[in-house]
A protein has these predicted regions:
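Beta1/beta-strand and adjacent pyrophosphate-binding region of the FAD-binding site
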Residues: 1-12, 166-176
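Glycine-rich dinucleotide-binding loop and its adjacent helix/turn
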Residues: 46, 137-192, 196, 224-225, ...
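Glycine-rich flavin
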Residues: 2-4, 20-27, 32-166, 199-203, ...
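FAD-site-proximal beta/loop scaffold in flavoenzymes
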Residues: 150-166, 258-259, 263-330
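Hydrophobic "anchor" residues
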Residues: 48, 121, 272, 299, ...
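Short hydrophobic core segments
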Residues: 7-9, 113, 128-138, 173, ...
Length: 453
């Protein structure tokens, strides 16, 4: 039996960063990984997706090259090279994490871990024990109870990231972050993209006004949206010339409708990875939504913590990272000032979108006295120079004390602007603090300064 100060199950953004942080502060760590180092984010999520997003952005820029006085006599998308580049980026970053896991004090174990009891984890024939255990097993794609989801060509984001050709017609079920990013990417790649969403608007994490404007902007590029639509089934059918296709049947406002596709992407959310962990043997409480934790991410078992997607609180890679750092700090007896109430997020469609804090919908529902300040990319010098005039920023301010309550935006550099507001919000800053901060000219970030004055 191997004993260390800390066992971490999972080497995603939460697990590997926590392991390194712990080792740097003198703890011995056993980190266990059933698949590839880096977890879903690096291997099947954030990084490969964002690599494809960059490819799509280059295509979009080339399609409008004439605006910049560049005459192109056509161009060819070499999809195998696109996917090769994606894999090279993933492998380079994975190699870096594997090197990081060689830090003195860290023992990296490959295999599937499950609990024997509240202090012991088993991997194969080996047993590992520690003073504290951190569960960081992430999440997996969630498939809705729809007839036909097991048919060939009905896939999740994992399979789409390894697809070997660009589908002529792509139907996406779900208009959340995953669905919207892939809709944007494959539309740029040349697919005819249809998106079916049950809710009234896409991207519920965003202010509904911002989400609607983003959807309309992407729609102008040819993506077809069917909102407030419930998918009933997916079936194999044939085209007029006898080729196999998939037909998605859905209901929109009580009326039946269909869309034909070559590939159907299921993008209806994710579920915590808890299967096979034998949490019952450790006495850890959980539900289908995830492992129950307190504000320090401790489970009902004092020495066991759960961070990231597996606790179901916030399925973002950076949320997992900072939750893991916070847990290590608690184990070390160190206080930190990480503010988990300020959790920014970004959607890398083209154009991109981002948010932090309250939306206008939430503020209205709470009856909060607030002021909404708006800015537009079309009025910004740098945005005009870049030909990136589609965009809007909404900044919400408490009328009583001027504190910034939230920022939601779409358009070029939205994630950068939201990052700035996140830093201010984490310190309880006011609109006056933003107005007094000198902003570089010319930058798109000046939109924030202009609406703060």
């Amino acid at each position: 039996m191997t004993k260390t100060n800390l066992i971490i199950i999972g080497s995603g953004p939460g697990g590997y960063r926590a392991a390194h942080h712990a080792a740097q502060h003198g703890l011995t760590v056993t980190i266990i990984e059933a698949a590839e180092a880096g977890g879903t984010c690096l291997n099947r999520g954030c990084i490969p997706t964002k690599t494809l997003c960059r490819n799509a952005e280059v295509i979009d820029t080339m399609q409008h090259a004439d605006v910049f006085g560049v005459a192109l006599d056509g161009f060819q998308l070499q999809f195998p090279k696109v996917m090769e580049r994606k894999q090279q980026v993933v492998e380079q970053l994975r190699s870096g994490i594997e090197t990081l896991m060689q830090t003195p004090g860290i023992t990296f174990v490959r295999g599937f871990a499950h609990f024997k009891d509240s202090e012991t984890v088993v991997v194969g024939d080996e047993e590992y024990t520690a003073d504290n255990i951190m569960i960081a097993t992430g999440s997996d794609s969630k498939c809705p109870p729809i007839e036909g989801t097991t048919l060939p060509g009905v896939i999740t984001s994992t399979e789409l990231l390894d697809i070997d050709n660009i589908p002529e017609r792509l139907c996406i079920i779900g208009a959340g972050v995953i669905g919207m990013e892939f809709a944007s990417v494959f539309s740029s790649f040349g697919s005819k993209v249809s998106v079916i969403e049950f809710l009234k608007e896409c991207l519920p994490v965003l202010d509904s006004d911002i989400a609607k404007r983003l959807r309309q902007t992407i729609g102008k590029r040819g993506v077809e949206f069917s909102m407030q639509s419930a998918v009933k089934s997916i079936a194999e059918t044939t085209t007029e010339d006898g080729k196999r296709q998939l037909t998605v049947t859905y209901e929109k406002k009580g009326k039946p409708a269909q869309v034909d596709a070559d590939v159907v992407l299921i993008a209806t959310g994710r579920k915590p990875n808890i299967e096979g962990l034998d949490l019952e043997l450790a006495g850890v409480e959980y539900s289908p939504k995830g492992i129950a934790v307190d504000d320090d991410f401790r489970t009902n078992v004092e020495s066991i913590y759960a961070i990231g997607d597996v606790n179901g609180r916030c399925m973002l890679a950076h949320a997992a990272t900072f939750q893991g750092l916070h847990v290590v700090n608690k184990i070390l007896g160190k206080e930190d000032e990480i503010n988990f109430d300020v959790m920014p997020s970004a959607i890398f469609t083209y154009p991109e979108a981002a948010s932090v804090g309250k939306s206008e919908d939430q503020l209205k529902a709470e009856g909060c006295e607030y002021e909404c300040r708006k800015g537009f990319h079309r009025s910004n010098g740098k945005a005009l120079a870049m030909n990136e005039t589609d965009g809007m920023v909404k900044l919400f301010v408490n009328k009583a004390d001027g504190k910034i309550l939230g920022c939601h935006a779409f358009g070029a550099h939205s994630s950068d602007m939201v990052q700035e507001i996140s830093a201010l919000m984490s310190k309880g800053a006011t609109i006056t603090d933003l107005a007094n901060a000198i902003h570089i000219h010319p930058t798109i970030g000046e939109i924030l300064h202009d609406i703060a004055l």
